[in-house]
């Protein structure tokens, strides 16, 4: 599939996955599609292409949620400014005080592409879903930490049907250490099943209706668990699956585990031992993946293993 040239941080393999899933959805009943985290619209555009090629789509609403803002001193600003200058859309940025609003950039890249595109500009915590339609496909490129993901569970997962598709865009990501355990809990409770991966994205299918009581049970399980143990469990669960660029992305779960062991569990010795054994193993069989993983580890050290602070610069 040839996609429009739109700046963004998802890979071509992830664009193809978004297109394939959107095109294959059964939208013959009244369903909606939801995207959490749209940036400039690269992922949005991929989904739109799929929906436009979906023969069962007759008026489904596509809801997109994003603050469409960042702070000048935040982590996201370098990408917002850099991409907008490179693609010559920086005149569409609205700068006020320490804030940069890029909603008009998103509108520029998505204008007249899909009749029923509904934009929600707000922080995730302030989001609501009031559409009466069930959600056929939920694409999540927003929460990197469990407290935000818990909001997603409460706000959006209640509206998913059995058979609905969910893509966690940054699942195989060293920032996602507190989100990954929650997804393992959902696997253990047989709420979801594995479909496939593309780069850092994980595609799953909803196998059991998720209600408020189930969300409470997930949270109770999470609060009582050792996060690094849950990450190890999902690492083992997925080790036998076909994972895109297996050595790199699967072992990014180990990077997330190391971050959790240091930041959340104060287990520095265990994290050091795991780091040494991981790099010794991967370095022998895949030096290129080991080099990329080393960059993740250096990123941890640079930020004292506290990635929440970087995230907060953009969202608080």
Predicted regions and their residues:
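Conserved SAM-binding loop and adjacent beta-strand
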Residues: 4-17
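S-adenosylmethionine/decaboxylated-SAM
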Residues: 2-4, 23-312
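A Trp-anchored, charged/polar loop motif used as the substrate-binding/catalytic surface
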Residues: 15-20, 122
